[in-house]
């Protein structure tokens, strides 16, 4: 069935239909791209909130080829799970910087990358990978207290701000972690699908 923007929006209006745990439905990323860009066409900055927000008319960059994804894996020394590869095939980061809103502090807005794009943001991605690697032992202990076991072979690849995709070899799906530092980290999405619905569409499975 062909999906247009209206039908895709209807798909997401019903929490019963769209929130099905971690199951990745066919064409999910294509439908997600349509819905998220539709949302951003009417986006406004919420000045009372802290943190990164998407600008009006933000769009996803075109996806990567298999060769570019392989190069990305090589640059970050990771083997990407199937769902992360499918995500990158459909979209490669966002085109506009995200706005870092400072709430009611009186500080001016700042700007930074939205969803990271390869190779545009490779240097920043590598810096963030190095940052979490330096505190890996403490990070593993922090996550263990949260009930999540980070395996030794799992790589952490940032996807947006301080959100990291867990890239373990030979896996279909990947959890997403929010890591401020090695002592402040949580599981932010049980899967990439769960994370994207929460981060971009403000949907939570209740």
For each feature predicted by the language model, list its residue ranges:
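Glycine-rich, aromatic-bearing surface loops/beta-hairpins
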Residues: 172-206
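Short, flexible beta-strand-to-coil junctions
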Residues: 91, 160-169, 180-182
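Substrate-binding/catalytic groove segments of enzymes
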Residues: 148-150, 165-171, 184-188
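A surface-exposed partner-binding patch
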Residues: 1-151, 155-157, 161
């Amino acid at each position: 069935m062909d999906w247009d923007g209206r039908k895709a929006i209807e798909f997401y209006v019903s929490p019963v239909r769209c929130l099905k745990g971690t199951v990745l439905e066919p064409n999910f990323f294509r439908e997600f791209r349509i819905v998220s860009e539709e949302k951003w066409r009417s986006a406004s900055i919420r000045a009372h909130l802290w943190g990164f927000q998407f600008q009006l008319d933000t769009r996803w960059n075109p996806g990567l080829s298999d060769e570019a994804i392989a190069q990305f894996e090589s640059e970050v020394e990771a083997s990407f799970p199937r769902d992360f590869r499918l995500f990158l095939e459909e979209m490669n980061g966002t085109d506009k910087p995200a706005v870092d809103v400072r709430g009611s502090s009186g500080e001016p807005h700042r700007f930074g990358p939205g969803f990271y794009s390869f190779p545009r943001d490779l240097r920043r991605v590598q810096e963030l990978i190095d940052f979490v690697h330096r505190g890996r032992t403490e990070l593993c202990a922090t996550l263990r207290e949260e009930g999540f076991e980070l395996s030794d072979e799992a790589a952490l690849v940032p996807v947006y701000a301080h959100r990291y995709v867990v890239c373990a070899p030979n896996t279909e799906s990947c959890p997403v972690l929010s890591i401020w530092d090695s002592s402040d980290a949580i599981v932010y999405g049980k899967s990439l699908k769960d994370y994207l619905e929460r981060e971009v569409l403000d949907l939570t499975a209740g």
